[in-house]
Amino acid sequence: MVKTRSTLNSTALRRNKLSTAVAMGVLMVSGDSIAESRVIEEVVITATRRAQSVQDVPINISVVTGDTIRETGVSDLNDLIRLVPGLVTTDLGADAGVNNSLIMRGLNANNPGTNNVLPNVVEPSVSTYLNNSPVFLNLKLADISRVEVLRGPQGTLYGSGSVGGTVRFIFNEPDTQAASASVSAGVSSSSHGDDLNYEFDFVGNLPLSDTAAVRISAGYEEEAGVTDAINISVLDSSGNVVPAGGDAIGGGHTTTTKDDTDGSEVKYVRASVLWDATDNTELLLSVFHQENESDSDTYMRLTDGQTSGEEWENGRRFLTPSEFEADVVSLEVESDFGFATFSSSTTFTETSVTARNDISNLYESIDEATGGIAYFGSPRLAFLTEAEGVFEAVTQEFRLVSNGDNDWDWVAGVYYNDTESDLIVHDVDHSYEAWLASVPDVYYGLGTFLDVLNTFSDRTPPFTGAYYQDRTLDFEDKAVFGELTYHFTEDFQATVGFRKFWQEFDASQVVALPYCGFYCAPDGNLNGSTSEANSAKFDDQLFKFNASYYVNQDSMLYLTWSEGFRHGGANSFPTAGFAGVDPSFIVFDPDEATNVEVGIKGTFGGTTNYTLAVYQIDWENIQLDVFAGALGIPGVVNGDEAKSRGVELELNSQLTDNLRIDFGIGYTDAEITKDAWLLNFTDFAIARDGDPLPGVPDVQASINVDYDKPLENGSSLHFNVNGSYRSSAETNFNADFGNHVEVDGFDKWNASVTWQKDSFSIRAFVNNITDEAGLSGVQNGRAAYSHIGFIGRPRTVGIRLNYEFNE
């Protein structure tokens, strides 16, 4: 038996001791030539399904501890990005709960400015987990133990959706040893807004006995609006646009302005109960609920249709409020069998979204493109998309993980997931029919325009307004997986992994263009509706190989060959009639990423941890969202091939007893490597060999500096400065695709100082010191007033108070 390097490799159930170390985020490592207080803190993770020091795991993993999250004021995903080099997202503000737009290692094919109201059909390229539950939320990052960021394809252990990587959010668990509580409150002010921001958080832990405890966290956050809407259409009592100058036939929009339109609220509560049922078995039941509400989106007005304009103004016709609600219930069971630890993870998830989006510009573009035929040249088209979606999922995973300090380590498991979603989209008319009714008898005595419309269109519920869509998706995934590691010597090990999966995807859809009537219906019905249902089945397998070698006590070389994938499926495109789409686009295949990575990680003198990795990922059958046919029905198609190559460096250094610096930088070269003809409404666009992958900056970097200053009265000061940089990026493959621009690079900086005395602390902070907008995506359709860019929060100055109670 030669495996003696780390006793942490055993997964024998030691939750009380281990979870305490993990919650603290540290295990101190020794150094012969340095003071005990100078050693770098070493984090314990469970990303490989066993507890290990992050420096002993032979892949590139970044960890953001709960302490760092609190000290830097990280609140959500958009904040977290600034601490993790190589992780990219489009800042959608409070609407980020609808779609997972995370990008890692350059693997992305969707436009970062894609409509954020309607959930994408295509699966994300980065999978996300709450503990062991595969769920995406725009999570309020409170009472978090750590965030684990696994770079590169993780298909064997984490399954579908992990082509670029995996992000795991690990919550603090109940503590059976002592009662504790904390309460914090903050107030801040953001540039360009008149009102204040507020936040409140509470965490309480209560032992119920020596073997059971309950933990509750809850909070509320309110962000004031900062964007002014300068072109809002005025509606009358019937909900129709008031014609300019009182001219019902030829008048355009009567408009007004509204200040600070993009305020938002977040409410959350999480309760968990831990029970040591026996000496060898523990159960953790968790219930999580979160609500996000947004008054409107945070846009900038692009006056040039590209990247320049008024940063805190919005030119859209309507405000775009949204509500997002999520419930997650999970049960985790662990039992130590001696030779191995058995784990069961059961999760029930339900999320719902209601949202509105201003799409007046789309209808104006259609009318313009058809020479005024589509909507008779109406001078004040005004349409709002109203969307309601419900998404439910059941996930079950059983795992068996070997224990003991043996030459062989192994993980084996089975996985099941059933996800159902139903989305109803309705484009509501706010002027067209009223305008039609005002136009006199011009069609050979048939009456008003509205009378003419009524002869070939029957707009009865639910087929009212201009567009209607009811989409239902059902996805079932079954898999077996495993990894096997052999330790040839204390310094050399090799791992092989596999995953075999069986998947079934069903899609059905009803789409209608009521104003188009029988002309747009394959069967000639008067409501212009068409329906379609399709299904597809897939089965395949993935593999992984990893080898690592300790060059010396402090440095490890590793090599990884791994695969990741996103599941295939079926589109519910109609194949006949006005909206017909070529039948070859009904089924879309899984895409697959193959990663080759070489890296070195280790420690300098006990004070600095480092990781350096070089990788190349070949991506085949790329999936991307499209709008197909004359109706622009959302779906997924396969592209061809792409390649992403890059270098990543991360340093974590305890320079002195009181000074720590974390630094990371990544370079990514991600591009199409084979021409692909991609469906684009009724036409095709070509993603050409050499085109960049959308939304991927070449360079990203982050730095976090912490300095502690003890004071004579027993109190202390903690100073923090952190910053992030991302270089320019193109928002689509080329100019043949919509919303294509090159957004400039930008950097953002934040600073804070915290005074602490015993259990009480005060934190003063400035976020986004330079008031950088940070443009990350655009929508630049035909109508100039509708050109928008997605930006982040402006400069925010505030103070936060915190009090902790510990028994």
Q: What annotation goes with each model-predicted range?
A:
Residues D201, S330-I359, Y550-R566, V587-Q654, ...:
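Membrane-embedded beta-barrel scaffold of Gram-negative outer-membrane proteins
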Residues T4, V428, I661, S724-N734, ...:
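C-terminal beta-signal and adjacent terminal beta-strands/loops
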Residues D491-A494, N609-D618, V637-F733, R800-N806:
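Gram-negative outer-membrane beta-barrel transporters
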Residues R38-T176, V598:
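Acidic, small-polar-rich N-terminal luminal/periplasmic segments of exported/outer-membrane proteins
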Residues I249-V411, N417-S421, V425, N609-T611:
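Outer-membrane beta-barrel domain signature, strongest for Gram-negative TonB-dependent receptors
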Residues V226-D260, D297-R317, D358-E386, H426-D470, ...:
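Solvent-exposed loop segments that connect transmembrane elements
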Residues L274-N280, L400-N403, G413-N417, R471-I617, ...:
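Structural signature of Gram-negative outer-membrane beta-barrels, strongest in the C-terminal barrel
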Residues G193-D295, D327, F391-E392, Q396, ...:
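Transmembrane beta-barrel wall of Gram-negative outer-membrane proteins
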